[in-house]
Structure formats: C-alpha cells, structure tokens
Amino acid sequence: MFCPLKLILLPVLLDYSLGLNDLNVSPPELTVHVGDSALMGCVFQSTEDKCIFKIDWTLSPGEHAKDEYVLYYYSNLSVPIGRFQNRVHLMGDILCNDGSLLLQDVQEADQGTYICEIRLKGESQVFKKAVVLHVLPEEPKELMVHVGGLIQMGCVFQSTEVKHVTKVEWIFSGRRAKEEIVFRYYHKLRMSVEYSQSWGHFQNRVNLVGDIFRNDGSIMLQGVRESDGGNYTCSIHLGNLVFKKTIVLHVSPEEPRTLVTPAALRPLVLGGNQLVIIVGIVCATILLLPVLILIVKKTCGNKSSVNSTVLVKNTKKTNPEIKEKPCHFERCEGEKHIYSPIIVREVIEEEEPSEKSEATYMTMHPVWPSLRSDRNNSLEKKSGGGMPKTQQAF
C-alpha cells in the first residue's frame, strides 16, 4: 500500500530539491543590448497534474541595492510592477508549469540577477530558478552604406530556453515603395527561401549569415542600390512568441574613402592602350629634350650679344668726348695698337658713399704699316719743342 505512495512522492521531492539547488549551481547568463528583448525561462518539471498557484519574479541588482519586484502572477492574474510595467510579460504556458518571462526594451538599470519562484497549489515547497542578465550599450539602429557596397543587419533574440525558430522574415518599406519581402526562412522546409525577381529586387543579393539554432536571423545585403534605402523589419518566430527589430538603412551615392589595406597596395595592371600612351609620351619627351636645350642656349646667346652692343652704343652717346688717342707702343711687327679710354659710370654703394674716380680702360686698334711714316713725321715735328722723344712718345 505504501509502495505506490513512495513512488509518487519520490519524483516530486526530487523535483523540489533540484529546484532549490538551482541557486547553488551557476545560473544561466544572457547578454543583450539596450533596447532589445530577453526571454528568461522558468519551467517547473513535475509528474503531478497540479496547477501553478503563484509566480514571483524579482530582481537583485547587486550587493548594495535592494531587491525589487518585477512581476507576480496570482489566480490567473499577471501584474507587472513599478518601472517594468508595459515591458514584462509571462510568455510560458501556465498549464505546463512554464512561467518564463519576456523582458522588452531592456535598459541599463535592468542588469542583475532575476529570480523566479513557482508555487503549486496545495504545496508548501517553492521552485526557484535564477538568470543573470548582462546589458550592453545600444546597437546602432541606423546604418550607413555606399552604393555598390555590402551591409550586415543583425537580428538576434536572446533566450535561456532552447526553442526552435519556426520562421524568420525580413520586410522592407521604403519612402516611395510599398512593403516588400526581402528574405524568409521556414523551419519546416529546413532551408532559406529567397524570392524570385517577380517578388522584388532583392533576389540573389540577400544571404542568411546568422545561426538559426541560436535564434540569430542576421542577413547580409550585397550590391547595395540607392533604392535599398529605407526601413528593414526583422521578425523571429519561436512558436507563438514573436520578436521584432527594425533597422533604418541610409544609402549614400558617394564613393567611400578606402583605407590603406594590403589589398589596396596590390600593383595596378595597365591595359594595352594605357601602356602604349605612356611609352609614347616618354619617347617624345626624350626626343624633344635636346632640341629644347639648343633653343634655350641660342636664345640666351642672342640676348647677351644684343645687350653688349646696346651697352657700347649707350656709352658712346653718354660720353661723346671719348676719342681714340694713339699710343705709340709697338707690340708686333706690321701693326700698331691705339688705346682709347672708356669711361664707366661710377658705382655708388648704399652703405658707404664713395668718391672714387672713374675707371679708365684702354682699347687697342690695329694700324696698318702705311701709316707708320706719317706717325713718325708728326712725332719728329712735335719733338722740336725741346722735350726728349721718349717722353713725348710716352
């Protein structure tokens, strides 16, 4: 008589003991971003068909903070409390002893340890389970991409319970376009389904990059066009539970400023026409370079000769008293040299005003031998004045 009773009580006591010891074992952890949702499981396994009488969810922020109520369930009534109103819901099946909690629009202050307590009707024992929630900064809801580039749009639903994703759907809505299905995944087909072009212009440009078994429905959009700018809404279905997330995509027509990467440092391969043009330019430059040098030299020589001629003419005009005076020194046979003074303008320095005399230079002009006798006769006549010939000649 007592054996069946022992067999019934033993699993129940084991279940209660496991539930109480869940706090001693390291609890599961969830990491979510600000603004996302988190599903914290609290499932009580029991062999008896007893209904849940009460469920309490509390938050323990830390050592120096007080615990606060999140939600409580009593007599088929679920009541969120305090700052968690409109953000928490019981998503489990109460009839199946499932008191899982869905926390939406997660805030930084929501970080901490969440404790679930389940009481069955007519039982004094309490089943407890803890979940540690870590909160990260908010992910950008607006993304920027350039035309022709690629962009990854994330969509992850964090949950402690292992639930199969039944459906993943991405819907696009632009400013000038109606809603259009971008990507759809069915769990029954066990394959991703991309719509043909008749369904939209995303065909062959969207790939699933997330892990469906981890509730990750992220996609990659390639070959971005200007018309791709708009809102992208992701929906992850876990049975009756639906998680949604919206991303705004901005498309810029400008080319991105590429960073210096090893791929960018690869040598550029020139085409046939470009190579011919470059070789032609180099050859023409080499051939024309000597001609340009000769032209420059000739131009400089002409300018110098013209300048010297103008200088001599200007000197004669400014000093008309300058005449050729004979000099009677014979330096070679058959010709004489006549020295005439050339007066050069005085150079005045700004720092030291000088009173230097004008410099005098002598120029030699050849005299033909036929004029030698006439010159000698004139010298003999002048020497009759009583001065020595050498001095007069000098």
UniProtKB/Swiss-Prot annotation:
Q: Which UniProt keywords apply?
A: Cell adhesion, Cell junction, Cell membrane, Disulfide bond, Glycoprotein, Immunity, Immunoglobulin domain, Membrane, Repeat, Signal, Transmembrane, Transmembrane helix
Q: Which SUPFAM superfamilies match?
A: Immunoglobulin
Membrane-related topology note? Single-pass type I membrane protein
Ig-like V-type domain location: 20-132, 137-250
List of glycosylated residues = 76, 231
State the signal peptide span. Answer: 1-19
Q: Which Pfam families match?
A: V-set (PF07686)
Expression across tissues is:
Expression is restricted to the hematopoietic tissues with the exception of liver. Expressed in fetal liver, spleen and thymus. Preferentially expressed by mature leukocytes (at protein level).
State the GO CC annotations: bicellular tight junction; nucleoplasm; plasma membrane
Q: Which InterPro entries match?
A: Ig-like_dom (IPR007110), Ig-like_dom_sf (IPR036179), Ig-like_fold (IPR013783), Ig_sub (IPR003599), Ig_V-set (IPR013106), Myelin_P0-rel (IPR000920)
Look up the record and give one Gene Ontology term from the biological process aspect.
neutrophil chemotaxis
In which residue ranges is the amino acid composition biased (Basic and acidic residues)?
372-383
- Disordered: annotated span: 369-394
The domain-related comment in the record is: The Ig-like V-type domain 1 mediates interaction with CXADR. The Ig-like V-type domain 2 may also play a role in the interaction.
Protein name stated in the entry: Junctional adhesion molecule-like
**What organism, scientifically named, is this protein from?**
Homo sapiens (Human)
The top of its lineage is:
Eukaryota, Metazoa, Chordata, Craniata, Vertebrata
